[in-house]
């Protein structure tokens, strides 16, 4: 920690750690993220999220009923001004196994992306490829990334608004080649809790804008939208995330998710709730013809007064 905390701050930090530990533990259980004997490669960027993820995973490792190994890995992408000593010094204090990799993806990105454009997308793809390869080299069975609940929701709206897809970040993902399993232990955690916890813990944060890349304006706009919703409608973000876990393909319009083409009614199926006509209650009759005023006749019934069948 960078400075002494007050008793109130210590209490708050303990409460946040317990909350994050509970949420991470629940996510791990719900999605079977970590199993007996796993070697978990914990990817560190030097930001608040990955620091918090490592901290909570190390805490859970001491309490978990299963045995698993944690290996911290950072990729130095040779961005100008990257402080090479910060992460090794911090990791040494934890006593956790770690690797610092070096690969000049910065030069590749600057060569491919026009000046003034955001480089984050290409940078992350190059970083992901390097980390996937290293995970196989060290025999990692899981690759842990620090994306949290807000990242997942933001990604869903970004894909909805700008890509025409209902797609987010899954808590657990098998790579396209089937060789790597990616997990997101912070999937249930709120960013504001992580930020507050990181500040209280005094993690040595490394800025993410050393490359000089412009902020992703679309993501920033979606993030601000969600921040305002959270202020104006408490509980809405939680409801959105709950909805993401309760999809109903048969109630949507995606033909790939549900087989509408072969959907057929069963002519032999009994009518649902079939009762004798004499047992049917009277229906209220609604008349909206009187200048928009609604008149209810509680005694009125709906009767079939005539039918016509064309020959």
Curated annotation (Swiss-Prot):
Organism in which the protein naturally occurs: Shewanella pealeana (strain ATCC 700345 / ANG-SQ1)
Regions annotated as coiled coil: none
Subcellular location: Cytoplasm
Lineage of producing organism: Bacteria, Pseudomonadati, Pseudomonadota, Gammaproteobacteria, Alteromonadales
One Pfam family hit: ATP_bind_3
Pathway note: tRNA modification
Protein transport keyword on record: no
Record note on cofactor: Binds 1 [4Fe-4S] cluster per subunit. The cluster is chelated by three Cys residues, the fourth Fe has a free coordination site that may bind a sulfur atom transferred from the persulfide of IscS.
GO biological process per UniProt: tRNA thio-modification
UniProt-recorded name of the protein: tRNA-cytidine(32) 2-sulfurtransferase
Catalytic activity: cytidine(32) in tRNA + S-sulfanyl-L-cysteinyl-[cysteine desulfurase] + AH2 + ATP = 2-thiocytidine(32) in tRNA + L-cysteinyl-[cysteine desulfurase] + A + AMP + diphosphate + H(+)
Note from the entry: The thiolation reaction likely consists of two steps: a first activation step by ATP to form an adenylated intermediate of the target base of tRNA, and a second nucleophilic substitution step of the sulfur (S) atom supplied by the hydrosulfide attached to the Fe-S cluster.
GO molecular function: 4 iron, 4 sulfur cluster binding; ATP binding; magnesium ion binding; sulfurtransferase activity; tRNA binding
InterPro entries: Rossmann-like_a/b/a_fold, TilS/TtcA_N, tRNA_Cyd_32_2_STrfase, tRNA_thiolation_TtcA_Ctu1
Task of the protein: Catalyzes the ATP-dependent 2-thiolation of cytidine in position 32 of tRNA, to form 2-thiocytidine (s(2)C32). The sulfur atoms are provided by the cysteine/cysteine desulfurase (IscS) system.
Quaternary structure annotation from Swiss-Prot or TrEMBL: Homodimer.
Enzyme Commission number(s) of this protein: 2.8.1.-
Domain of life: Bacteria
Binding site for [4Fe-4S] cluster: 120, 123, 211
Cross-referenced CDD domains: TtcA-like (cd24138)
Cofactor(s) needed for function: Mg(2+); [4Fe-4S] cluster
Gene (UniProt): ttcA
PANTHER family listed in its UniProt record: AMINOTRAN_5 DOMAIN-CONTAINING PROTEIN (PTHR43686:SF1), SULFURTRANSFERASE-RELATED (PTHR43686)
Motif placement: PP-loop motif: 45-50
Similarity comment: family membership: Belongs to the TtcA family.
